[in-house]
């Protein structure tokens, strides 16, 4: 799955982002939820972990 699609879906769900050196941190209600690596394509197993950590269906 493309990184920009993950960011877009999380933003629609109310997440805000903080850019780091190699990752983007996702927060909701001021609480840190997950980290998204700076890769064009995110592996399926990582997408599943992001879904579990955020509670947002991405696929």
For each predicted feature, which ranges?
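Basic nucleic-acid-binding interfaces
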Residues: 1-20, 28-59
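Short aromatic-glycine-enriched beta-strand elements
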Residues: 24
